Amino acid sequence: MVYTALTWQRLHGTAAGLVPSHLPQEGEKGSTHPTPRPLGTTPRVTAHIEPPRPWAAGAEPPLPAGDGSARESSPFIGSAAADGDSLLEGKNMALFEEEMDSNPMVSSLLNKLANYTNLSQGVVDHEEAEDSRPRESKAPCMGTFIGVYLPCLQNILGVILFLRLTWIVGAAGVLESFLVVSMCCTCTMLTAVSMSAIATNGVVPAGGSYYMISRSLGPEFGGAVGLCFYLGTTFAGAMYILGTIEIFLTYISPGAAVFQAETPEGEAAALLHNMRVYGSCTLALMAVVVFVGVKYVNKLALVFLACVVLSILAIYAGVIKTAFDPPDIPVCLLGNRTLARRGFDTCAKVRAVSNGTATTALWGLFCNGSSLDTACNEYFAQNNVTEIQGIPGVASGVLLDNLWSAYSDRGAFVEKKGVASVPTPEDGRASGLPYVLSDITTYFTVLVGIYFPSVTGIMAGSNRSGDLKDAQKSIPTGTILAIVTTSFIYLSCIVLFGACIEGVVLRDKFGEALQGNLVIGMLAWPSPWVIVIGSFFSTCGAGLQSLTGAPRLLQAIARDGIVPFLQVFGHGKANGEPTWALLLTALICETGILIASLDSVAPILSMFFLMCYMFVNLACAVQTLLRTPNWRPRFKYYHWTLSFLGMSLCLALMFICSWYYALFAMLIAGCIYKYIEYRGAEKEWGDGIRGLSLNAARYALLRVEHGPPHTKNWRPQVLVMLTLDAEQRVTHPRLLSFTSQLKAGKGLTIVGSVLEGTFLDKHVEAQRAEENIRALMGAEKMKGFCQLVVSSSLRDGCSHLIQAAGLGGMKHNTVLMAWPEAWKQPDSPYSWKYFVDTVRDTTAAQQALLVAKNIDAFPQNQERFSEGSIDVWWVVHDGGMLMLLPFLLRQHKVWRKCRMRIFTVAQVDDNSVQMKKDLQMFLYHLRISAEVEVVEMVENDISAFTYEKTLLMEQRSQMLKQMQLTKGEREREAQLIHDRNTASHTAASRAQAPPTPDKVQMTWTKEKLTAEKHRNKDAGAAGFRDLFSLKPDHSNVRRMHTAVKLNGVVLSRSQDAQLVLLNMPGPPKNRQGDENYMEFLEVLTEGLNRVVLVRGGGREVITIYS
């Protein structure tokens, strides 16, 4: 190097006479420091974090609220608002000052990056519109228990538990019921694991499950799944309303029925008609409540949840009570057939009276008269009437009788196993007799379809994401705990029901053998009414919640605009309430109510929820297998095999429940998918397989041509700029090794190089060079494209590659090149000029630039680092690429065991403690694990080392401009000038008097003493003396000060790092200082082993929402 005579001692000493008087001396006031920024200001950030755009020309940046800081009001170093009296104001970061408007200091952004605020929608807007008083904006404050666990618990536990679980246990037996519940709970648990990975892959937006799914799956899948989720939620509302009416008409007020059955055979039809009438009225009432006062629905949610919890506690209390005091609940059997307790009170054929024997009311139901000699039903005549206990208790041993299934056909008798019965030929099996009959045909798959809705509701926590204090932590924890809790409740209830309740009572769906009482209510303690009233209010509340959530879901889909014919439903009242969406939801819900049967509606919503869960698992599996850069879930306990198993289980359950419903639901989802995908797109058919492949490639290229990818989907698509030697071999093969470690075979990689000359003369060399490059790419196992350009100059060839490499949307957004190590050597005098122009070209093309320094020291793919660190020095914020690179590198085996450390620089007036907290919070939201350190750079005086290094740099530059030398002579002449200058200063220093106290003694080195003894006494040296009287430019002094200071700080902490990533300052706007720019970068990275200089292009973004 030119400056070999400069020693480390000069960092601490000042050469006499070298520091001009206008520089601030030790103890003098060189600059004024403004008051620190108040810590209370927390700006709201609700979108992805991008580099801020420059302010309007001539305008001052807005002053943050409550901050009177002069520097904060003008955050750009060297701006017009800076203190004009101090030429060295902000000299610590002067190297980056020309781009401070677009790439601000990290310290000025950390507070905004870390302390984002979610915007909640829907209900909050409605409440604020209805309340005339001004509200203070409240930060999200819900924790895991209140915000996720309890809502999931309320949504999962519901109508099926109270109305159908005992019947499922009776029909399928304890073992098969256990299998049904285990399958469904396993399905939701695997889905919850996949959902947790998706929910923790970025900040969950305040829009709930649809936003989470659609932003992960894309518009096509997102729209299809979103509509399936909407239809499932809507039919869930119908199911809850039907459950509410069934409880009311069957167990609370049977006399309120509008339609009365004249015969026992007409009871089922009358019940369906009553369900339709009351269900429609209830739906209308609930829709009015949701339209008028949705805030009351949310305030009553805890009341409804309390009903559910109390009902479940009453069940467990009743089970415990049966162990020592079983209730007296007699059930009447005729032979082995269960009798419905209607029209008789005594379970006997005859009864004893004072003067003999008399027939009972039961006799009159089976015989033509009340006398003992009248003709009776043959089965009644040949079988005895017995009475058993309906709930014999836990200690009775009835569990063994209930272990196995007892499926039956529709209209079959509910019979007790093991009881003697004399079969008789029947004509008209029931014919109006008081038997308990099966109302539907039961088998395993039917019960799965009916039961599955009881495990849905796992997304209730993510629907409240905008109100959660820490959604990334609360959603996985609360959801999985809720599923574990409810799974335990369901599985334990299956065993307890089978151990406590007689089998015929379990199979009695409507409690006809118990005088029309709810079976699970008769088990509960202290009263059956606890269960009846609790289940009534819980199902009513669940229906209200469905009618509240479904219209908002439809409104979100409509506002996304992915399904054009639904856009009308995105509008609503002035306060944002989804009026039209509520109307459509009520109409769809009415179709479910007109079906009128809870057992028929349940499989429908099972299909839609299973479809939704299947795509959630698919999304997680695909994201994991693709390893996209934005896939960094904070929830680590997921694997693609679990997601694939969950997806397969969802698909299997769909066809188990009902194959024709499954095909119908998939057809709906497929039609929606294709409608969104091909909306406005032209289809073109090719000929044969080749034509199909070419058409698919063309279609895919046209799809990505329409615009740049969304910021969340940004990933580095790399153009690698290689240099070739005279034999067309790659000069730095490890640049390709580094590329393969960075890309890991994913995304686009273009390897480019330039040959100087004309294509007619160089086409053979070009082919040989391309073959060499492809062979090297194969050796490095790197998949990509090779593009070689022959150009009249290297400069133009590099520019052409940057502009034109790639095809259509498959274009690079990042340029990777090696640092020109020989830029000072005589044989490559223009290498620095090509390099600086390439930097400018990438900036103009809005492409990121990676410059690998000391590339030959980088590891090959076969090497492994067993320890060490990747150090990121984040000085200015230019889009977040610095954060993304170490994450991508650590996916490769070479760098996997390296830990990541992030350093950022604080100035004197920055609160470094708060900066560290903000940076840790920002990294937490980015899902990046790294050690964090804030380094304080004190604005001390510029050292003599910096001043003299700047002076020598400018003298060399000025001399080369004055002397018209040949290319080979320039470097040698510059070295000669440096030697003469050294000798001249040595002679002048000897003639001087001893230093005064305000001067600092120069430290002499052995090299300088040798130079003094053997100095060149050529008289021509005097001719250069006027050149050395120049004073260095103040801006160059400040830039060199930045480079020296920052280099010293980086060396002190990262000298032993395996890799250092550092912000790359932009080239000067004045092209006359290009060679100085190279010197600044050289000083900035001096002493570091492996360095990658990173310069953002403005489009790359790493976001907290990815």
UniProtKB/Swiss-Prot annotation:
Residues annotated as binding chloride 1: G457, I458, Y613
Cytoplasmic side: 1-143, 197-220, 465-474, 556-578, 623-636, 676-1106
Tissue expression notes: Widely expressed. Higher levels in heart, kidney and lung (at protein level).
Transmembrane segments annotated in the record for this chain: 144-166, 174-196, 221-249, 274-295, 296-324, 444-464, 475-497, 529-555, 579-597, 598-622, 637-659, 660-675
Residues that hold chloride 2 according to the record: V159, P453
Carbohydrate-modified residues: N336, N355, N384
Pfam families registered for this protein in UniProt: AA_permease, SLC12
Residues engaged in binding K(+): N155, I156, P453, T456
Membrane topology: Multi-pass membrane protein
Keywords tagged on the record: Cell membrane, Chloride, Glycoprotein, Ion transport, Membrane, Metal-binding, Phosphoprotein, Potassium, Potassium transport, Symport, Transmembrane, Transmembrane helix, Transport
Residue(s) carrying Phosphoserine: S74, S86
Region spans: Scissor helix: 688-704
PTM-bearing positions, type Phosphothreonine: T996, T1003
Molecular function (Gene Ontology), one example: potassium:chloride symporter activity
Cellular compartments per GO CC: plasma membrane; synapse
Region (Disordered) location: 17-83, 980-999
Catalytic activity: K(+)(in) + chloride(in) = K(+)(out) + chloride(out)
GO biological process terms, semicolon-separated: cell volume homeostasis; chemical synaptic transmission; chloride ion homeostasis; potassium ion homeostasis; potassium ion import across plasma membrane; potassium ion transmembrane transport
Subcellular localization: Cell membrane
Ranges facing Extracellular side: 167-173, 250-273, 325-443, 498-528
Quaternary data: Homodimer; adopts a domain-swap conformation at the scissor helices connecting the transmembrane domain and C-terminal domain. Heterodimer with K-Cl cotransporter SLC12A5.
Family classification: Belongs to the SLC12A transporter family. K/Cl co-transporter subfamily.
Protein name: Solute carrier family 12 member 7
Taxonomic source organism: Oryctolagus cuniculus
